[in-house]
């Protein structure tokens, strides 16, 4: 219990070395990699995500925390893939065309990975064909689109409409996120879910 709490604090403070050490200690104690991931890393990142959403933490701190989580993940990933833990889903994520902010989708990507989803991140300024090609190539079931500018938000609808035009909209769960968005907008563009700033 104590070390888990400590890990949450270290994650919150973005201390990558400490997170790597803590992760190793858990593994040495015989913890399953999935348990370390869930209890120490994902739980800790949820707190970071909540405080980011509530304006207590800002982008630089969140990036440090994400970086610290990566240090722990680096130790866990080889074990997880060797033990043949199948991803629960495959997701393609990217910031829409015209938008070059990637913090939100990076966070969502990390959270989803923490939850056992395999994530293919297309980066920023992604156009509709790139999204669709990636969905088909990776055999994904979830599409995540992020936009931080009100001017680029409508492009999400362009992507959804293109999926509809090709008759494949229903194959995917579509999640949209970003600062100016809300549930009403998600519904308007035809998405299934809206997640506020990766929270």
Label for each model-derived stretch:
Residues 86-122:
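Glycine-rich active-site/cofactor-binding loop and its immediate structural neighborhood
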Residues 5, 17-20, 24, 70, ...:
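Amphipathic, non-transmembrane alpha-helical secondary structure
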Residues 193-198:
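Short acidic-hydrophobic, aromatic-tinged amphipathic segments that line or gate anion-handling sites
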């Amino acid at each position: 219990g104590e070390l888990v709490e400590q890990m949450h604090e270290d994650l919150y403070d973005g201390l990558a070395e400490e997170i790597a050490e803590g992760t190793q200690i858990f593994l040495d104690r015989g913890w399953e990699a999935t348990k370390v991931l869930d209890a120490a890393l994902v739980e800790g990142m949820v707190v970071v995500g909540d405080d980011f959403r509530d304006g207590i933490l800002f982008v630089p701190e969140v990036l440090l925390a994400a970086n610290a989580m990566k240090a722990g993940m680096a130790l866990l990933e080889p074990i997880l893939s060797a033990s043949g833990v199948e991803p629960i889903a495959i997701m393609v994520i990217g910031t829409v065309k015209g938008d070059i902010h990637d913090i939100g989708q990076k966070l969502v990507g990390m959270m989803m990975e923490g939850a056992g989803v395999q994530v293919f991140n297309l980066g920023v300024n992604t156009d509709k064909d790139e999204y669709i090609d990636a969905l088909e190539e990776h055999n994904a079931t979830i599409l995540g689109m992020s936009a931080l500018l009100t001017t680029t938000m409508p492009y999400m609808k362009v992507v959804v409409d293109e999926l509809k035009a090709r008759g494949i909209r229903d194959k995917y769960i579509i999640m949209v996120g970003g600062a100016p968005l809300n549930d009403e907008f998600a519904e308007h563009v035809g998405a299934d879910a809206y997640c506020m700033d990766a929270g």
